[in-house]
Amino acid sequence: MMDRYSFIMHQHRDDTVWCPSKIEEQNITRISEFHLMGLSDDLQLQPILFGLFLSMYLVTLLGNLLIILTVSSDSHLHSPMYFFLSNLSLADVSFTSTTLPKMIVDIQTHNRAISYSGCLTQMSFFMLFGCLDSLLLTAMAYDRFVAICHPLHYQFIMNPRLCGLLVFLSVLISLFVSQLHNSVVLQLTYFKSVDISHFFCDPSQLLNLACSDTFTNNIVMYFVGAISGFLPISGIFFSYYKIVSSILRMPSPGGKYKAFSTCGSHLSVVCLFYGTGLGVYLSSAVSLSPRKGAVASIVYTVVTPMLNPFIYSLRNQDIKRAMWRLLRKTV
């Protein structure tokens, strides 16, 4: 039987904001599910969206798994740079798999409901792998900094123990951020609506729907944002400031070009990841349409992980040669 709160939310979805009083809270059961907005209500558009996102998901899986397989199977790529790249590919696959399969199933079944526990789980993994992506990009920037600014000590500094420690710390910090965020959301007992204006359980959307005072929660969220966003970006900026300063001091144009080319792929991925994320944030702040914001967020949740393998493979001769060797072994 549907509880009173769920019934009221169902009857007044999208046009009524309702929060229980202190007395009513005692007789109201927590909501059992949310409803995701999706990208379009046009039924004729659903098969196209299904085919498009299924194709993008398969390309993302195949591209990133191919990078992982290539790096792990070729001894020429057993270096710190490619170690971080394979971990980034694994994080990208996990990041996309957090949201995209659910959206594909929703399009096919025309059912956009997600359980309360399912929503929290999706949100936790979204924060975990999103933060992990960010921290791994920072570790890769540090690797490039050591390679260009301290080339004679590169092998000594970037030893396997340090590389493993950097990845371990990235996972540990990401878990901390995810659990800290979860602890904030679990305190939100009642919501103004069960409709989430997104195609997945976006953390900011849940906070916007909360009935309780979210001042303290917002402070915690800003702290989480600083850990997962500001600190990694600061580390990347500092690394590239040192890299550019070192390159400009090189006497030969050939040396400058070679040094810049080793950073080209990573810098492209950094600009794509943070640039699209910032673009989505700014567009959602300016646009009054939640659906436009949801469509824009596809760029960093789906498109960026899909393009990363192509960016690294197209600009990297070592990856290309390793892929050809792997292909010849397979055939």
UniProtKB/Swiss-Prot annotation:
- Cite the Pfam families for this sequence: 7tm_4
Gene Ontology MF annotations: G protein-coupled receptor activity; olfactory receptor activity
Q: How does it sit in the membrane?
A: Multi-pass membrane protein
Q: Which residues are glycosylated?
A: N27
The entry's keywords:
Cell membrane, Disulfide bond, G-protein coupled receptor, Glycoprotein, Membrane, Olfaction, Receptor, Sensory transduction, Transducer, Transmembrane, Transmembrane helix
Subcellular localization: Cell membrane
What PANTHER family would the database entry show? OLFACTORY RECEPTOR (PTHR48001)
Q: Family membership, please give it.
A: Belongs to the G-protein coupled receptor 1 family.
What name does this protein carry? Olfactory receptor 7E178
Identify the species of origin. Answer: Mus musculus
Q: Please name the taxonomic classification of the source.
A: Eukaryota, Metazoa, Chordata, Craniata, Vertebrata
Chain's gene name: Or7e178
